[in-house]
Amino acid sequence: MRSLFENIFPVVESLRKRKQLRCFFFMRKPPGLRLRFALHSLRGDAVREIESCIKSLVRRKVIAKWFPSVYEPETFKFGGPEAMEAVHAHFFADSKAWWRWEELRRGANTSIESRLLSLSVLNDLFAKFLDGPEEVWDVWCRVATLHGASVVSEGPAIQAIRIEDLIDRVTPGEQVILRSYLSCNGAMARRFGAIHAKGKLLFGNRLVLPHVALYHWNRFGFTPDDRASIFTAMMHAWSPNV
């Protein structure tokens, strides 16, 4: 998989700089990966460049096969058409941040583990959207129930760590990643606020945010145990009943 992304992300960045790409993100989904490209136009060399890259990966046996498909966004899961655009922008930023993190991690240039990075990012995201710790706790409870887990107040003694708690304690490379999350989290929260003010948000933030968390964890490749360790700790950390 590493070789695939080593080839894909330079193409993504090149298309973005040439203003041919609106969005890119990926999902881990059987039988492999789903790569989602949103181009400004299907004409021109952008499609050929993407296909050439992927066909080269097949020839070099980096991947077994590929096929194009129609993308049908889960619009209503994420709050409606306008909200979906904001979520896609966040997915793009999250995908790029994940790859930067992977490059640091493989080079042994990280000072924190992936789960700590993730919980700080999600705590920051939830807090930017919501009014107070009780609402953040409620979202973590919803994340737990989406995994079939029970809402509990017991858990490991850990603080509700946010990005600002880590950013001055990590390596310069990690700081770049955390700053990118501060930016994209803030951008999505502001966009949702504007959509809500226009009456165009079909479902509330606390219904949408758990699904954003699940997609983020999918990109990071977290196991069920990884996920449970995060949401269990955060239910305890944010609980108003502790």
Q: Language-model segments: what does each one mean?
A:
Residues 1-242:
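An acidic, charge-biased composition feature
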